[in-house]
Amino acid sequence: MKAAVLHGQEDVRIEETDAPILQTGEVRIRIGTALTCGTDLKVYRRGYHARMITPPAVFGHEFSGTITEMAEDVAGWKIGDRVVAANSAPCGECLYCKNHQPNLCDDLLFLNGAYAESIVVPARIVEKNLLPLSTDIAFPDAAL
């Protein structure tokens, strides 16, 4: 699949990449819209983000789209569902999460890869931060 891959400081290349294989609890989403935010710009200028992305890696984290594939154990979703996903999910188990401060999570899971034809959403994000979209919400509006 075609993807925008971050290789380092101000170095993003359009490349053919292998589509990741689904693991337990994951879904594949065909990208409807992928947007660029201030964090993307900072990462592009710096060439990395200490916790979020290590080059080379498919870039982008704000997106919406349609589920095209699901691991066998995924429940509550179906192929063709329109969705938006947050780019992270807390662990729910660390001291910060248990104290209702998930933004400080010791094991915050980040998701990148929206600047591609499709993205695989990890199980924790599917469970905690994958949201359905009604048909009256456009993909660009949802990704915002």
Predicted regions mapped to residue ranges:
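NAD(P)H dinucleotide-binding glycine-rich loop of Rossmann-like/cofactor-binding domains
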Residues: 91-144
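Glycine-rich beta-strand-centered segment in the early N-terminal region that forms part
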Residues: 20-34, 48-95, 125, 134
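Extreme N-terminal starter segment of soluble prokaryotic enzymes
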Residues: 1-2
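N-terminal glycine-rich cofactor-binding segment
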Residues: 5-21, 38-69, 84, 98-112
